[in-house]
Amino acid sequence: RFDSAMLMKDLPRASGDHYRILDCGMKSFPIEALSHAPLTAMMKCVKENGIKPGDVAEIKVEVIARAADILGDPHKYRPDSKETADHSLPYCMAVGLVDGMVTPLQFKEERVLDKSLIPVMDKVKVVANEEFEKLFPKFQPSQVTISTTAGKSFTKRVDVPKGDPRDPMTAEEIGVKFHALGDSVIGKAACDRLSAAILGMEKIGNVRELTALTVRA
């Protein structure tokens, strides 16, 4: 028997109450789910320490065993399609390091097949960390250690990926993703207008004002 009262259980009843919809995760990268935490760790490590692509000698990636098996097998070091590349930890780490971002643009055929990324992919070493198994799936622990050509070493660990409600994307990061998805469809200017409308949706008097912005000129 369907319990209709369940639909109302624990719903916010005052303006200061917390809405669970705000706890939804958002994929910050268009890649396989288990790749998000290690890529987050690397991007943070690079930014925090001012690491340049040419400075990197090795990127050691510690993840749970299933992530290492699925995302770091030998074939993933030579992706030949978008479908392989977005499930390849070596590719995602390499293109993220070189391009400074991982968006749909990084999975266009010409980028996936770009041979200049091969030496960078070969610097990525994916290993399983048994200690991380105890924390999964509540957490998705990943640790990245970047060794530089100057002999320095930088380590960053994250337990949740960027986009998890415990480490939410910023408005700027959401904007980058939005434009990466929409610019080629409706154009940058239209994307700017649509983004502003969505972020200010509570000010819109009629939903037609919003839907009109989704029509290609």
Please describe what each predicted stretch is.
Residues 1-217:
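Terminal-appendage/accessory-domain detector
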